[in-house]
C-alpha cells in the first residue's frame, strides 16, 4: 500500500515540507487521516528541536485515534533526540508490534530500521532487510536503500571499507530501483565513491563523484560535500589544481560554524586560502 505521506517530505527543506503537510491536513476527511498527518508535523518539530511542540502534536494525534503505530514511531524518534543510550527503544518496539498486527509493513520496516539504530543492529537490520526484500510493495522495498546505507556507514566507521562498499552498492541499486528522489540516489553514489577511495581506488571514486556533480549541475543543486569528496579524489590522484578548485568551491558552500577539522582539511586542499 506504500506510504502515501512520504512524497510530501523533503528533509533538506523542513519549511516547505511543513507547508505541504498542513495543506494535506486540510484535505483529510477522517480523524485517522488527520492523526497520520499530525505525526509528520510532529516529526518536523522534533527535527527542529522544538520538542514541546512535537509532544503536543503527538498528543493531539493520539487523541484522534487510528494512527497508533505512527504515534509510537514518532514518540520513539523524539525520545532518541535526547541522546540517551537506548532512548526510544520501547516506543520503536511498540510501533513495530502495532504495525505488524495491523498489516502495515511500511511502518513495520521503518520501526525495525529505527530499532537497528538504537538496539541490536545486526538482528534488526537482518529482519528489516528480509521483510523489505521479500515485499511486492515498492513502499516497503524502498527501505532497502536506508537499511543498506546504515550498514555501509557502520562498516565504514569500523574500518571495513570493503564491506562498506558492498553495502553502499546495494543501497545505490535500491535507490535507483525504488526511490524516485534523484538527490537520494546521488547521496548513495557519493557513499560508494567514498568507500572506493578508502580502498585506494581513487580513479573510480572520482568517476562516481563526477557523476554526482554532473547531476547536481543539471538539477541546479549546490552541494559542498560533492565538491569536497572530488577534491579528496583528485588529491589522491595528484591532480592538485583540480583538487584546489573543488576544495575552494566546497569552502564557499560550507557554513563558518561547520566542523573545524573539516574546514581545516578543506583549507589545506585549497592551498590554505583565506575564506
Q: Which residues are covered by each model-predicted region?
A:
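TPR/TPR-like alpha-solenoid signature
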Residues: 2, 39, 73, 109, ...
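Structural motif corresponding to the intra-repeat A-B loop/turn of tetratricopeptide repeats
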Residues: 11, 48, 82, 102, ...
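Amphipathic alpha-helical segments of tetratricopeptide repeats
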Residues: 25-26, 59-63, 93-100, 104, ...
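Residue signature of alpha-solenoid helical repeat architecture, marking inter-repeat boundaries
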Residues: 32, 66, 102, 106, ...
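Residue register of alpha-helical TPR repeats
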Residues: 36, 70, 110, 139-142, ...
